[in-house]
From Swiss-Prot:
Residues 23-32, 64-77 have a biased composition (Acidic residues). Residues 760-794 are cytoplasmic. Highly expressed in pancreas. This is Protein sel-1 homolog 1. Residues 643-723 are annotated as: Interaction with SYVN1. The gene is SEL1L.
Length: 794
């Protein structure tokens, strides 16, 4: 009985297994008919140890296979093709060949380009582009077999890994992708025109392309166009439109947009001023890596603007920016930027601003064409570095240096060597040619050539590395005062290259190079003071040096752009650019922005806000040591511009300008306040003292001081009269005791002598006058021509 029951159970189990196998086979056939690209289950991907990753449509593998090409095994010439078999079964056959098949040969490995799927989606819509799978084109993708319902289709197939998969894109995503491709093309076209031409008409055309790209939400184009609208660069100035773009960029996480929005809130342009919001946006911009935001935060922490003053925080921000600036320094040097102060230019019209007049430039060009070597070298340097009203132009610099070098000028040879050593679009980089020019210049004793030759031996450019020769040439250049030689000597002593490490010698040569204005010398000194290497650590000194380096970055070129805008009469564009640079800590920009606001030349600032904003920037410029700004602060408090009248505060600012900068104007003002008793007790003697000090401090103050002293004498006399009783003075006066008992006779004699002298002088004057001549006959009146008189009838 038990045996029968066991057999019955066994028979039932066999029947159930057969029924299950039949249903699985039918399901597999149905699935194969629905889609030939569907995997039977998600386990086929999950079970692989070398599963790949798909990010934004790009394929990333964790295996050792190449990203660009994958080695796949070629299919056999004929695959078993039966109507009920699925693609998965074919793949399984190829992945696991029958070991018992003796005729089976290992497939040969071939190289095929890896196709990449375009974008991705998880929405489940069918894709609308043909894709390749097993060398066949298909028009559909499917989400079958995926728990997340995401579309997938194979773009290439790896028979070992079975895991290279791409995602299809929807029609909407495809349209967006095509739009972004068009926007990128517009952006690249605009940037090519913008960087390749100096003509304003072509730059305006470039911004038309950038505007089209910006309208398609191209991030970089939006950044360019928004700043152009803010500054009025080749586009009409529109602060509101710029603000809207900055807000859009900020929502997308653009550091440039965040920094610009912080600037608008800090300056109150297009929005209500809010230093708190400005600080937030500046912080986000800095976290995103924007260097201008780091500069702004560095200055704010250094000066304590809106935050607690912190030297270490300022050092962190400034050092980060200085690292970028120092790494961007080239051998030939960047463009030269003049820091022109508008108040000084107005107060002293004859002052040399450093800008060359067009007539003078043309005169030098005329001399250079006539063969004047000095003019050729001078123009070459002007065009190499730019500045002083001359645009940077390496082609012209190369041509002028060539002319002078052919004439035997060592300076021109050395600069040609620098241009070849650095390389550019105009001059191809060539160590051999650079070495040739450096040697010729060094043999003639030129320090620039000696320094260049030292660089060649130091870094092995065209020659074998030789530290002894490098040290020799750097010393020769440094002895002649060439800053590059001094800098490199300092670096060799600092790092112990070719010499024994000596921080004192390094500090000495870095100081010498910094006196010549070398940016890297400032940078190296800042590093030494920040770390306390060779010197006592000084955060304050390090911050000041790093700040100096940061202000030599490429963004400093906007100082000249703002100055040119001011000279062209575009005061709104000038003041906005100066305000942005003022936020970065440029003292020149702070004083110039305050000056434009003080003159009420910018219409974008309301009349009620002009003086308060000017006062703010005068204050920041004064804290950086600008004398005129300190005197302006005294004037604003004296007259009540942008603040209440406060004579005591005005007196403090004048005294600071007098003691720290020895300003004659401040001394004169202190004398006046002592004379009038404004903000301090009246003291005529101290007033005279300050007037005298002003006359000694400046020859220009002598005439005003003389007039002030005359007035002071009258004031002193009147004050003496008020304090003295005149009647009592004459009553107490004893003439007999003062002049003697016969003082009246002396007085009468003196009066008689004076009268006699006057009478004699008048008589002599009368005798010297010539006698009057008798009047001559009167001339006859001119005859009038007319008709003859008619005789009366008789």
């Amino acid at each position: 009985m038990r045996v029968r029951i066991g057999l019955t159970l066994l028979l039932c189990a066999v029947l159930l297994s057969l029924a299950s196998a039949s249903s699985d086979e039918e399901g597999s056939q149905d699935e194969s008919l629905d889609s030939k690209t569907t995997l039977t289950s998600d386990e086929s991907v999950k079970d692989h140890t070398t599963a790949g990753r798909v990010v934004a449509g790009q394929i990333f593998l964790d295996s050792e296979e190449s990203e660009l090409e994958s080695s796949i095994q070629e299919e056999e010439d004929s695959l078993k093709s039966q109507e009920g078999e699925s693609v998965t079964e074919d793949i399984s056959f190829l992945e696991s060949p029958n070991p018992e098949n003796k005729d089976y040969e290992e497939p040969k490995k071939v190289r095929k380009p890896a196709l990449t799927a375009i974008e991705g989606t998880a929405h489940g819509e069918p894709c609308h582009f043909p894709f390749l799978f097993l060398d066949k084109e298909y028009d559909e993708c499917t989400s079958d077999g995926r728990e997340d319902g995401r579309l997938w289709c194979a773009t290439t197939y790896d028979y070992k890994a079975d895991e290279k998969w791409g995602f299809c894109e929807t029609e909407e995503e495809a349209a967006k992708r095509r739009q972004m491709q068009e926007a990128e093309m517009m952006y690249q076209t605009g940037m090519k025109i913008l960087n390749g031409s100096n003509k304003k008409s072509q730059k305006r055309e470039a911004y038309r392309y950038l505007q089209k790209a910006a309208s398609m939400n191209h991030t970089k184009a939006l950044e360019r166009v928004s700043y152009a609208l803010l500054f009025g660069d080749y586009l009409p100035q529109n602060i509101q439109a710029a603000r809207e773009m900055f807000e859009k960029l900020t929502e997308e996480g653009s550091p440039k947009g965040q920094t610009a929005l912080g600037f608008l809130y800090a300056s109150g342009l297009g929005v209500n001023s809010s230093q708190a919001k400005a600080l937030v946006y500046y912080t986000f911009g800095a976290l995103g890596g924007n260097l201008i935001a780091h500069m702004v935060l560095g200055y704010r922490y250094w000066a304590g603007i809106g935050v607690l003053q912190s030297c270490e925080s300022a050092l962190t921000h400034y050092r980060l920016v200085a690292n970028h600036v120092a790494s961007d320094i080239s051998l030939t040097g960047g463009s030269v930027v003049q820091r022109i102060r508008l108040p000084d230019e107005v107060e002293n019209p004859g002052m040399n601003s450093g800008m060359l007049e067009e007539d003078l430039i043309q005169y030098y060009q005329f001399l250079a064409e006539k063969g004047d070597v000095q003019a050729q070298v001078g123009l070459g340097q002007l065009h190499l570095h730019g500045g002083r009203g001359v645009e940077q132009n390496h082609q012209r610099a190369f041509d002028y240096f060539n002319l002078a070098a052919n004439a035997g000028n060592s300076h021109a040879m050395a600069f040609l060597g620098k241009m070849y050593s650095e390389g550019s679009d105009i001059v191809p980089q060539s160590n051999e040619t650079a070495l040739h020019y450096f040697k010729k210049a060094a043999d003639m004793g030129n320090p620039v050539g000696q320094s260049g030759l030292g660089m060649a031996y130091l870094y092995g450019r065209g020659v074998q590395v030789n530290y002894d020769l490098a040290l020799k040439y750097f010393q020769k250049a440094a002895e002649q005062g060439w800053v590059d030689g001094q800098l490199q000597l300092g670096s060799m002593y600092y790092n112990g290259i070719g010499v024994k490490r000596d921080y004192k010698q390094a500090l000495k040569y870095f100081n010498l190079a910094s006196q010549g204005g070398h940016i890297l010398a400032f940078y190296n000194l800042a590093q030494m003071h920040a770390s306390g290497t060779g010197v006592m650590r000084s955060c304050h000194t390090a911050v000041e040096l790093f700040k100096n380096v940061c202000e030599r970055g490429r963004w400093s070129e906007r100082l000249m752009t703002a100055y040119n805008s001011y000279k062209d009469g575009d005061y709104n564009a000038a003041v906005i650019q100066y305000l942005l640079l003022a936020e970065q800590g440029y003292e020149v920009a702070q004083s110039n922005a305050a000056f434009i606001l003080d003159q009420r030349e910018a219409s974008i600032v309301g009349e009620n806000e002009t003086y308060p904003r000017a006062l703010l920037h005068w204050n920041r410029a004064a804290s950086q040591g600008y004398t005129v700004a300190r005197i302006k602060l005294g004037d604003y408090h004296f007259y009540g511009f942008g603040t209440d009248v406060d004579y005591e505060t005005a007196f403090i600012h004048y005294r600071l300008a007098s003691e720290q900068q020895h300003s004659a104007q401040a001394m004169f003002n202190l004398g006046y306040m002592h004379e009038k008793g404004l903000g301090i007790k009246q003291d005529i003697h101290l007033a005279k003292r300050f007037y005298d000090m002003a006359a000694e401090a400046s020859p220009d103050a002598q005439v005003p001081v003389f007039l002030a002293l005359c007035k002071l004498g009258v004031v002193y006399f009147l004050q003496y009269i008020r304090e003295t009783n005149i009647r009592d003075m004459f009553t107490q006066l004893d003439m007999d005791q003062l002049l003697g008992p016969e003082w009246d006779l002396y007085l009468m004699t003196i009066i008689a002598l004076l009268l006699g002298t006057v009478i004699a002088y008048r008589q002599r004057q009368h005798q010297d006058m010539p006698a009057p001549r008798p009047p001559g006959p009167r001339p006859a009146p001119p005859q009038q021509e007319g008709p003859p008189e008619q005789q009366p009838p008789q």
